[in-house]
Every structure is written in C-alpha cells, then in structure tokens.
Amino acid sequence: MSYAEFEADVVVDARDCIVGRVASQVAQRALDGERVAVVNAEQAVITGSEEDVMSVYRQRDAVGSDRGPNYPKRPDRIFKRAVRGMVPYEKTRGREALGRVRVYVGNPYKDGAASPRGEDGEAVEAEVLEDTSLDRLSNIKFVSLGDVSENLGANVTW
C-alpha cells in the first residue's frame, strides 16, 4: 500500500515525544475509529539511560528460538508493536484498530500531496499530542528509537 492509499484522519508527529505516551493516545484514537498516521518514528524517545534501555531490548531479543517470539528492529515497527500492546489485538475490534494505524520513518506527508485535508481543503499539519513531549521530563536520560534500532542491528535507511 502506498502512502497515498492511506487517508489518515489525523497525522501525529512523534519527534521528541515519549513512545509510550504517544502510543497510548494513538491506540485510543484508533479504537475510537480514527485513522491515525504517525510520522518521524525514528525521532521518538524512550526514557532511561541507553544502557538500561538496550539491556531490555537485547534480553528480549536473546530469549526464544528461530520460531519466535520475534521482535522488530526498525523504529516504525517498534512503535507499532508498542501500539499493538495497548489494543486487544487478538479480538476483531483490536485488529481493526491496529489496521487504522500507520507508522512512518520520516514524514511522507511533508510535501502536502498526500496529506489529509481539513474542512477548508487545506492540508492538515502533523500535530504533537498533549502531554507527550520530551520537555516535560525532569530526567535527562533518554534514547531515540533510531538509536535503539541501530544498536539492534537494523539497516539504517533514515
């Protein structure tokens, strides 16, 4: 499916936002029936020191076998997996909600051609969700999803 085929109701910018907070709001909107596109997933952040965050992901990756469980390495897939954990994905309602979410590395909507349109016909700008921004942290320790992906061995294409 190309970018143009997914007509999002809302575009969310995840740049410098906390992954879990954005994912929970995106999951709720998807469950409410909105089509949500999340852009700049590689610039979203996970709080905690890089050593702590990477140890969790490495331990998760080491457990299991060739058959699974398999965990994503790309930042857009890591973000979508976080959203999946917040919807009842084994039920029809959750599967449909997960289908209403698209996560992108970078911003395919920046040119305005495929952007969702408002009531006046103008392209809708990507919004930053309330209470998700990194500036609300008193803790300075965080790591971006792009860095996590790179350390997990993903091919850096962003």
Which role does the model predict for each range below?
Residues 1-81, 88, 131-158:
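Ribosome large-subunit tunnel/peptidyl-transferase-proximal elements
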Residues 94-95, 106-156:
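Strongly charged
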Residues 69-117:
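Mid-chain, well-packed structural core segment of small domains
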